[in-house]
Amino acid sequence: MADREWILLNPGPANTTPTVRAALVMPDLCHREPECFEMVRRCRDGLTRLAGAGNDWTAVLFAGSGTASVEAAICSAIPPGRAILVVDNGVYGDRMARIARAHGIPVETVRADMFTPIDPSAVDAALGARPEISHVAVVHHETTTGLLNPVAEIAKVAARRGRRVIVDAMSSLFGERLTIAADGLDFVTASANKCLQGIPGVSFVLCRRSAVEALADRSPRSVYLDLHTHYAQQERDNTPFTPAVQVLHALEQALAELEREGLDRRIARYAENARVLRDGMAGLGFEILVAGPGRSNILTTFRLLPGLTYDVLHDAMKRRGYIIYAGQGDIRTYAFRVSNMGTLTPADMNAVVHAFADSLKELGIEVGHRSVSTRQK
């Protein structure tokens, strides 16, 4: 495991390179000096360029976890007197709805179970029935289960209906294919510490410039999280509040490392990581709970084997240097999650499978082969 004390199999913060971590140890820098603003601009430019967003998009940075960027987009984008349609098929879709309600924004939801991608026709029907809806909010990769929602199709539906889309791409941007400049998309939120392989503490909103500039005359719902305030200040090489200076320095290093690896190669590495993990876990008898077509290449939810509890399995894996992740919500009692983002390689994932096998042997759990693609509750 070389420079890593733990192999992190949680969906962020992910394992990082020594050079990203070393970037945190920089000379002290005042956040209102030109050197800091130049770093902010380089990070903003790098994010939009590497995301393939184009010149009519920009990035707005926030000091905070990923949820800060989601809340900034939602509380800023919805005009007074309008409503938001939230796709809810997991914990993070539900969180988007709770954010909107906390700001007094009327919310309509379209739901599916946490193992099923949303049907775009359900979004279309909801938009047709509710003319007061101005925006659709959808999580691209629901890390509740490792489910991918069809963002491109939802964006097309919204565009046909004259509505705009907010995407939570927290755990998919730079790890799954996502066309940022698709018709209908206005705001895409993410953070530094997932597929970007940076350090927690900075999140961002990729914004269509015309959409964020349209917020200029809007009365803000939030002091700290008003999207246009941050955009306008950052455009002028300024900041309304103190940014996470050292974390931004690490973000700049993470962007440089993504550029060197190449986005296509990173996505391919994650996909191969997932394949090695899933094939190996199937050989141990673990069942994947999300069917193939809607499954991400970043996280897998497995059913616990008979006689096995999560806490016991977690502790056995931790003794071997691996941190797995509990199921969320209703599935916590019978499922657990394994992510393969970050600096992990297929060789690492092979070692993960061997650690699971060794843990099961220690715990006296029978190992047997099952299909990798079945799901029955």
Annotate each predicted stretch with a short phrase.
Residues A23-A72, V91, R95-R101:
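Conserved N-terminal alpha-helix of the aminotransferase class I/II PLP-enzyme fold
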Residues A181-N193:
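Conserved active-site segment immediately N-terminal to the catalytic lysine
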Residues N15-T16, N193-D279, G283:
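Active-site C-terminal subdomain of aminotransferase-like
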Residues E287-M317:
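Conserved PLP-binding catalytic core of the aspartate aminotransferase-like
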Residues I78-D94:
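Conserved PLP-anchoring active-site segment centered on the Schiff-base-forming lysine
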Residues P117-F174:
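Active-site phosphate-binding strand-loop segment of PLP-dependent enzymes
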Residues M1, D330, Y334-K377:
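PLP-dependent enzyme catalytic core of the Aspartate aminotransferase-like
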Residues M1-P34:
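N-terminal "arm"/small-domain region of PLP-dependent enzymes with the aminotransferase-like
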